[in-house]
Amino acid sequence: MGEHEYPEDVRTFAFRNWALRLGLDVKGLVYADGPFTVENGRLQGRQLVQDHADDLPDAVIVAADPLAVGVLQAFATENVMVPRDIKVISINNQEIAKYTSPALSSYDISQDELAKAAVLMLAEALTANRKISQHMRISTSLVARDSFTPQD
């Protein structure tokens, strides 16, 4: 709620920040341009394969299921086998995730919790005329399917 100024998309910023904290080298491995569409996912997936054909990352985390559908399509076109050659995890757990090939592992974001938090924040902003920005955390859970299965 409210305006924020970040040097890049907040998810990309958070990903880079956590990678740095965990000592992961992600230089040249973050593809974060364009809309969250299947077509853009195909473009980003194709670009990743072209850029890293000789040394693919172990896995990719895709910001939204429609993008991930395109990434899976690009990998199939480029003969990159998921999950053998690269694992794919997405975010939102939309209905389409269970119908892709392979079925897409995706983080489910509690829509009920998100809606409740949004309504409470809106009510607070309206009654208190609050203009201070606020961040919140919403519960997620991984719905593991064929594109990525956590190891025990």
Segments from the language model and where they lie:
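Bacterial carbohydrate/catabolite-sensing allosteric modules
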Residues: 1-152
